């Protein structure tokens, strides 16, 4: 992309979830971030002011609904309403991390489908398009009646490992059956076979590794997942792979939620390196030496430009 974008009708705004990523995206596109402010009334209510005219403009709002999830979601909904009332031509939400995505179905009776509720709220507020990255459940796209561009970070993560020249004995590992499609995409790019961890989860945030489907003995394993939350799944998988004869274990994910005991578990695990993206802003206390972060700014910036110019974005899905 060029260093400067000349269409004055294109505007990019950032809320509070990931300002640093938003600045990187704006730089990739070649424009300055729009002027807005997010403040709070004395009772905690959110107040948003858009400090420039956006009448007739095509606006892109960068906001992940990561921790604090409800605060960030409410900021987004209020911002959408403000943009709609200020006569924006289109309101495009760029949500690198879609919170509540793991509540995509009724796992038990009398449970909500919160991922659908969030989609309803975003649409009802006035959004006209969504751009997002590696949703936990791809079928969430069907919860929206507006266009949604669902990008993935597989190419970015694959290129990282390809450039490290880890040898010919690579195996890409899915930590569960649900991640096989993602693992296969990476395996195809790295020209490597795949293995699958067969696990059972007795209760939320507790994972038990049961079996390894595939040959990992004498291999360098790369575990790929969409979200690492408490890191129970990924660290138990790494331990199981080493016990099965893997020589080294690397791990990567699109969304480093990293809650509770995650950092301690990763630090004490046999994982050589954990590679994550910056879809979620990480505070200093969530950094350890064996972590490395890759930026999705170029991918999201390219998507914004292509959408704005009515160009195809299909090559970004590959």
Swiss-Prot record:
Q: How is the cofactor bound?
A: Binds 2 Mg(2+) ions per subunit.
Q: Name one GO biological process term.
A: purine nucleotide biosynthetic process
Protein name listed in UniProt: Ribose-phosphate pyrophosphokinase 1
Binding-site residues, Mg(2+) 2: 176
Entries under InterPro entries matching the protein? PRib_PP_synth_CS, Pribosyltran_N, PRibTrfase_dom, PRTase-like, Rib-P_diPkinase, Rib-P_diPkinase_bac
What UniProt keywords are attached to this protein's entry?
ATP-binding, Cytoplasm, Kinase, Magnesium, Metal-binding, Nucleotide biosynthesis, Nucleotide-binding, Transferase
> Which residues are recorded as binding Mg(2+) 1?
136
Q: Which Pfam families match?
A: Pribosyl_synth, Pribosyltran_N
Repeat in keyword set: no
CDD domains named among the record's database cross-references = PRTases_typeI
Q: What does this protein do?
A: Involved in the biosynthesis of the central metabolite phospho-alpha-D-ribosyl-1-pyrophosphate (PRPP) via the transfer of pyrophosphoryl group from ATP to 1-hydroxyl of ribose-5-phosphate (Rib-5-P).
Q: Which cofactor does it need?
A: Mg(2+)
Q: Which family does it belong to?
A: Belongs to the ribose-phosphate pyrophosphokinase family. Class I subfamily.
Highest taxon above the source species: Bacteria
Pathway given in the UniProt record: Metabolic intermediate biosynthesis; 5-phospho-alpha-D-ribose 1-diphosphate biosynthesis; 5-phospho-alpha-D-ribose 1-diphosphate from D-ribose 5-phosphate (route I): step 1/1
Q: How does it assemble?
A: Homohexamer.
């Amino acid at each position: 992309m060029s260093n400067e974008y000349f269409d004055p009708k294109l505007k990019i705004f950032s809320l509070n979830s990931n300002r640093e990523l938003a600045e990187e995206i704006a730089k990739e596109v070649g424009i300055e971030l729009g002027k807005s402010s997010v403040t709070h009334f004395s009772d905690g209510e959110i107040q948003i002011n858009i400090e420039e005219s956006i009448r007739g403009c095509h606006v892109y709002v960068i906001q992940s609904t990561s921790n604090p999830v409800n605060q960030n979601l409410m900021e987004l909904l209020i911002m959408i309403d403000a943009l709609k009332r200020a006569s924006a031509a289109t309101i495009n939400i760029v949500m690198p991390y879609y919170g509540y995505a793991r509540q995509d179905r009724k796992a038990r009776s009398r449970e909500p489908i919160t991922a659908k509720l969030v989609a309803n709220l975003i649409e009802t507020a006035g959004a006209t398009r969504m751009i997002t990255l590696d949703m936990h459940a791809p079928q969430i796209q069907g919860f929206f009646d507006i266009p949604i561009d669902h990008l993935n970070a597989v190419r970015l993560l694959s290129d990282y490992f390809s450039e490290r020249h880890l040898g010919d004995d690579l195996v890409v590992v899915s930590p569960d059956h649900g991640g096989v499609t993602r693992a296969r995409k990476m395996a195809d790019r790295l020209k490597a076979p795949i293995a699958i961890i067969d696990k059972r989860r007795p209760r939320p945030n507790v994972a038990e590794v049961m079996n390894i489907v595939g040959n990992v003995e004498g291999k360098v394993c790369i575990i790929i997942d969409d979200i690492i939350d408490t890191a129970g799944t990924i660290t138990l998988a790494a331990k199981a792979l080493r016990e099965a004869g893997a020589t080294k274990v690397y791990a990567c994910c699109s969304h480093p939620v990293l809650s509770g005991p995650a950092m301690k578990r990763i630090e004490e695990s046999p994982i050589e390196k954990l590679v994550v993206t910056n879809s979620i802003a990480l505070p200093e206390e969530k950094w350890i030496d064996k972590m490395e972060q890759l930026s999705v700014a170029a991918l999201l910036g390219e998507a914004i430009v292509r959408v704005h110019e009515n160009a195809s974005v299909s090559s970004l899905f590959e």
